[in-house]
From Swiss-Prot:
Pathway: Protein modification; protein ubiquitination. This is Ankyrin repeat and SOCS box protein 5. Residues 278-329 form the SOCS box domain. The SOCS box domain mediates the interaction with the Elongin BC complex, an adapter module in different E3 ubiquitin-protein ligase complexes. Pfam families: Ank_2 (PF12796), SOCS_box (PF07525).
């Protein structure tokens, strides 16, 4: 009992220390929020000089210098789509390529928020269209992740690289995995390699099959993606069978997927399909039924035309019915 009484003062002192730390934290947070609101008020009201002074004191930078703070006024304006505030800050001389500790630029923020007008303003002011974060993410990757075809098109027009090294995050794979087929369509129109394989992800077609994104799978196959290329020895058909996606399995088979392809474990697509499932029945039926002559002819002609020239099929001097047939329409 006496031991508890001796320890009580120390416990009270310790609790007082924690209470003091918490109070200081809350006070600093209140000050920061107040300054941010005040800075925004001055920007909106057009008092550029006062806004610049508050921003410089708050973020510890001067006009024209890069920001290594966690967030700069440009980042906030771009992420929230506040075009007027963004233009005001740029007119004050703030660095359009200001970065955070993770190398995130205002352009990254604008694209992630699908703020096309802000992205255009930043690009016109000289923003680095191929800026890379510490994680290897580009503004184009953010646009495709968000599903913003307008931002993606804008970035490509300003010189964004549609595909980078295989070790960096891929806009194509991101669009395919999230089902953003409009972004994928734009990337394809800019000449990406639809069969780009990233070691830990596989090809865009494989990623789309794993995510069961039918429209993206159709876009990739229509653009000439190799129906056999997946992740290592796993084919897209393995992925579709594993996900029990009958619609995707039928589509892959229509484009010539090999049902006898084996992965690293020597398993065929039918072996990874759920037992007694519809996918298993489809694969068994396809295995027992030879491909029709017209399907084999279509695959042969498309292969002869070649992936880079498939988009020219509508220009061939052929009957419309035959052109539609070659385009799976």
């Amino acid at each position: 009992m006496s031991v508890l009484e001796e320890n009580r003062p120390f416990a009270q002192q310790l609790s007082n220390v924690y209470f003091t730390i918490l109070s200081l934290f809350c006070f600093k947070l209140f000050v920061k929020i107040s300054l941010a609101i005040l800075s925004h008020f001055y920007i909106v009201k057009g008092n550029r000089k006062e806004a610049a002074r508050i921003a410089a004191e708050f973020y510890g930078v001067t006009q024209g210098q890069g920001s290594w703070a966690d967030r700069s006024p440009l980042h906030e304006a771009a992420s929230q789509g506040r075009l007027l505030a963004l233009r005001t800050l740029l007119s004050q001389g703030y660095n359009v390529n200001a970065v955070t500790l993770d190398h995130v630029t205002p352009l990254h923020e604008a694209c992630l928020g699908d703020h096309v007008a802000c992205a255009r303003t930043l690009l016109e002011a000289g923003a680095n269209v191929n800026a890379i974060t510490i994680d290897g993410v580009t503004p184009l990757f953010n646009a495709c992740s968000q599903g913003s075809p307008s931002c993606a098109e804008l970035l490509l027009e300003y010189g964004a690289k549609a595909q980078l090294e295989s070790c960096l995050p891929s806009p194509t794979h991101e669009a395919a995995s999230k089902g953003h087929h409009e972004c994928l369509d734009i990337l394809i129109s800019w000449g990406i390699d639809v069969d780009q394989e990233i070691p830990h992800l596989g090809t865009p077609l494989y990623v789309a099959c794993m995510s069961q994104q039918f429209h993206c799978i159709w876009k990739l196959l229509y653009a000439g993606a190799d129906v056999q290329k997946g992740k290592y020895w796993d084919t897209p058909l393995h992925a579709a069978a594993q996900q029990s996606s009958t619609e995707i399995v039928n589509l892959l088979l229509e484009f010539g997927a090999d049902i006898n392809a084996k992965n690293t474990e020597l398993l065929r697509p039918i072996d990874v399909a759920t037992s007694s499932s519809m996918v298993e029945r489809i694969l068994l039926q396809h295995e027992a039924t030879p491909s029709s002559l017209y399907q084999l002819c279509r695959l042969c002609i498309r292969s002869y035309i070649g992936k880079p020239r498939l988009h020219l099929i509508p220009q061939l001097q052929l009957p419309t019915l035959l052109k539609n047939f070659l385009q799976y329409r």
